Amino acid sequence: MKDVPAFLQQSQSSGPGQAAVWHRLEELYTKKLWHQLTLQVLDFVQDPCFAQGDGLIKLYENFISEFEHRVNPLSLVEIILHVVRQMTDPNVALTFLEKTREKVKSSDEAVILCKTAIGALKLNIGDLQATKETIEDVEEMLNNLPGVTSVHSRFYDLSSKYYQTIGNHASYYKDALRFLGCVDIKDLPVSEQQERAFTLGLAGLLGEGVFNFGELLMHPVLESLRNTDRQWLIDTLYAFNSGDVDRFQTLKSAWGQQPDLAANEAQLLRKIQLLCLMEMTFTRPANHRQLTFEEIAKSAKITVNKVELLVMKALSVGLVRGSIDEVDKRVHMTWVQPRVLDLQQIKGMKDRLELWCTDVKSMELLVEHQAQDILT
């Protein structure tokens, strides 16, 4: 049994500037007000004044460990995460977290947060296989939770960093966007917003099978790059989203300076040509989706004899549905993969809807005026 009062008294005298905080901790502990004490400790461990040295480790060993069984499991893990940051040996930290996981097994959220922290440590020491296994294990548990919880953001932060480390652009893009969907962008420093926006943009362009840029384009994190030396990335993303091959080629002087993009120029060109075909299909009225080979070739900046190959590729990966008429050199599209739209694309839909409403109104007036003839 540790002498908690003695530890708290000693802490009060050793840090006069924080004496009131230590006194408050002692008061709540003595009165056994566990909920209020938990909240006070949560505030305490987040105070930058106590982030240095091993003060939080001593706090845990001499104080928190005496009543941790009375603390809400998720809150306990939140506290523990601050404690392990002061452990210089990652193996010691891992052992500590494993023991904590056993203590909080009554709460799925607490276990998930604990395992996520373990995965982050594994990633930091370069144990990629263990990190992968942890992510797979936690993701299965996460899918069983109702709604979005406070642990979702930490998991997606871990998984996106893992995918970034192994160079899986598509998975990074997906989970990094999920992370942003779980946090308030205002809580992230501008420098972090800019870095996340930049890596997300690159991952979207380079990611295999990523054809949906609307969610990123509509997210405020991208605005952190506006009017900076990385503005070109926003422009390039908009070019891809609208399938504007001309614009993409015009911007080459900017994106061509980025090594990863320059090294994958041919892949990027193929992707934007597919997006061009999608956009051509999307902007046509549903009853007028006959595209000629010449129209496709002109927009996608390819020769006519390569159009069929482009369309077949789009059909094979499920971006569009339709049929090719080789004799008349036409493509009849019946469906295009749904995407998150940017404001310009939404405006285009609005214009087409208004045109449709006008046509319906005209038909209504026609029937009204000629009703007698029709009835007789």
From Swiss-Prot:
Coiled coil: none
Pfam families: PCI (PF01399), PSD13_N (PF22037)
One cellular-component annotation, GO: nucleus
GO-annotated biological processes: meiosis I; ubiquitin-dependent protein catabolic process
InterPro entries named in the record: PCI_dom (IPR000717), PSD13_N (IPR054179), PSMD13 (IPR035298), WH_DNA-bd_sf (IPR036390)
PTM annotation (N6-acetyllysine): residues: K298
Physiological role: Component of the 26S proteasome, a multiprotein complex involved in the ATP-dependent degradation of ubiquitinated proteins. This complex plays a key role in the maintenance of protein homeostasis by removing misfolded or damaged proteins, which could impair cellular functions, and by removing proteins whose functions are no longer required. Therefore, the proteasome participates in numerous cellular processes, including cell cycle progression, apoptosis, or DNA damage repair.
Entry similarity comment: Belongs to the proteasome subunit S11 family.
Protein name: 26S proteasome non-ATPase regulatory subunit 13
Source organism: Rattus norvegicus (Rat)
Lineage, uppermost ranks: Eukaryota, Metazoa, Chordata, Craniata, Vertebrata
